[in-house]
């Protein structure tokens, strides 16, 4: 056995994944758009982490495709939203089927039901934040190929109950 020094550590996740986590970043009509694709856990975690870059009061919309219910709230405290997302992270990553948007007049973060992250903004600051999280800008990303309609999401009563409880905790109103 030869010892050549310290080998760089590579996690199994990094070694055997199909493609690097990536995003597209475009600029049209005064708005920047980022579309982020990675594994489900990473996308949900990015939504939670990047939401910390929003101002202290944000607007929130939640749409549960399984139950068909939607909620909306204006000027909701960011720490409360982040706490609710933290509680939902595992269920969202596991089941999907919930669209969650946190936005202001300047920025919008949207986690879609297929567990992809979209960012809409008036400035390009999100490009640098995404690169800082280790994501690679790509010409195009492979969208989730398993997109289905509402009837094809697997039953997830735990997620439906957790989303309903989160909407109540945040004081969101039915949309």
Where are these regions (language model features)?
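Structured alpha/beta or helical-core interaction and ligand-binding surfaces enriched in interleaved
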Residues: 1-116, 120-175
